[in-house]
């Protein structure tokens, strides 16, 4: 089973990356979308049209994607609505989406289970709470956002509104907060 979490780069670059792994778009069994921001869906239209890959996302995310005009024509039959904290199975992988705090329609992170092993992909978190900690405990592998150094962001070139968005509870985890979260999740098998 081969799954993609988001398709933020162009369809062409996605295909090139897959080819580098010895795969093609035809090998992909599903695309799991975390949220509708362009850096997570740029290549979605191309991948759907060229390869007919099923797409999974929350109702809010899929509705927001349908409003994005630069993705081109999308086949509605490829889209499947999922819900946070409701497991589903794609071939031999159990997928369990979890709610996250981000400035998008209905964003999620994804937890996976295969052959007794667990992993999670958790990016674009504005904050974390006990739900997040409990949801990410006991993973064997974890891809976790560590987005910025607070001081560097504050003195950097971004406009004020963007700095506030990134620093907000629905923005992105700072390196420090990511480290604190990771320290609560660490165990011998991670």
Describe the role of every protein-language-model region.
Residues 11-57:
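Active-site metal-binding motif and surrounding structural segment of the metallo-beta-lactamase
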């Amino acid at each position: 089973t081969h799954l993609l979490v988001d398709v933020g780069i162009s369809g062409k670059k996605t295909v090139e990356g897959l080819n580098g792994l010895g795969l093609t778009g035809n090998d992909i069994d599903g695309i799991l979308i975390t949220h509708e921001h362009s850096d997570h869906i740029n290549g979605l239209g191309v991948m759907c049209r060229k390869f007919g890959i099923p797409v999974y996302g929350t109702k809010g995310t899929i509705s927001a994607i349908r409003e994005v005009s630069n993705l081109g024509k999308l086949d509605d039959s490829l889209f499947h609505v999922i819900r946070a904290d409701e497991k589903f199975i794609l071939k031999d992988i159990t997928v369990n989406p979890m709610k996250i705090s981000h400035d998008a329609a209905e964003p999620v992170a994804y937890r996976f289970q295969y052959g007794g092993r667990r992993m999670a992909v958790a990016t674009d978190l504005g904050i974390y709470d006990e739900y997040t900690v409990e949801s990410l405990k006991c993973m064997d592998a974890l891809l976790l956002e560590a987005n910025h150094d607070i001081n560097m962001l504050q003195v950097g070139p971004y406009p004020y509104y963007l700095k506030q968005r990134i620093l907000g509870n629905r923005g992105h985890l700072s390196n420090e907060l990511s480290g604190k979260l990771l320290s609560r999740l660490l165990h011998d098998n991670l």
